[in-house]
Amino acid sequence: MNNNNSFNFIDSQYSTPQGAYYDNTGRMGGGGGMGGPTDSFDNELPLLEELGINFDHIRSKTLSVLNPLKKIDSHIMDDTDLGGPILFGLLLGFSLLMSGKIQFGYIYGLGLIGCVSMYIVLNLMSEKGIDIYRVISVLGYCLLPMIFLSFTSLIININGMVGYILIGFAIVWSTYSASKMFVKVLSMIDQRILVAYPVGLLYTGFALITAF
C-alpha cells in the first residue's frame, strides 16, 4: 500500500502540468491564457531595431541624397538614424586610408565642429527647432558625394582641372542635398541660401581633406 502511494506521488511530480503540452520541438507550452517565456521572446524587437539601425530608412535616405532633384518627404527625418552617418564616416576614412591619408581625426573633428555649429545656427534661424541627432543624420548622409570623390581619387589624380571640377561638383551636390533636407524638415524654404552657406563651408572642408 505504501509503495503504491510513493509511485503516485512521483508520477504527480513529473507529469505534464494541467493545460500544458509539448510541441514538435520538445518544448513545453501552456494551454491557458497566461503567456509563457516564449511569448515574451516572440514579442521582442529585433536587435538592429533596438540599436536604432533600420536598413529601410538607410536605403530611403541614401536614395534621397543620390537623387537630390526628387521631392523629399517632410517626415524623412522623423526618426533619429545614426547608423547611416556612422557607416558613411567610416567609408570616407577607409577610402582616404587606401590613398595613404590617415585622416580619421580630421574627419571626426571637422564633423563634430560642423554638426554643433549647424545645430546652433538652425535653432537660431528656425521656429520649430531641431535636435543635434537629426543634424548629424542629415550631414552624415550627405557625405555620400565626398565618398564618391575620395574613391575617384584612387583612380585618377584630382589635383588638376578635371579634379577641381569634380571637387566643386561634390561640394555643390552635398550642399544642395543637405540644405534641401533642412529647409524641408524645418519649413525654411525662404531661407535656403542662408542655410546652404554654412553647409557649403562644412563640405568644402571635407573636400579639402579628401583632395589634399
Curated annotation (Swiss-Prot):
GO terms for biological process: endoplasmic reticulum to Golgi vesicle-mediated transport; protein transport; vesicle fusion with Golgi apparatus. Coiled coil: none annotated. Keywords: Endoplasmic reticulum, ER-Golgi transport, Golgi apparatus, Membrane, Protein transport, Transmembrane, Transmembrane helix, Transport. GO terms for cellular component: endoplasmic reticulum membrane; trans-Golgi network. InterPro entries: Yip1/4-like (IPR045231), Yip1_dom (IPR006977). Residues 1-79, 123-128, 187-191 are cytoplasmic. Disulfide bonds: none annotated. It comes from the Eukaryota. It is found in: Endoplasmic reticulum membrane; Golgi apparatus, cis-Golgi network membrane. The chain crosses the membrane at residues 80-100, 102-122, 129-149, 164-186, 192-212. Pfam families: Yip1 (PF04893). It is a multi-pass membrane protein. Residues 101, 150-163 are lumenal. Plays a role in transport between endoplasmic reticulum and Golgi. Belongs to the YIP1 family. This is Protein YIPF5 homolog. The gene is yipf5.
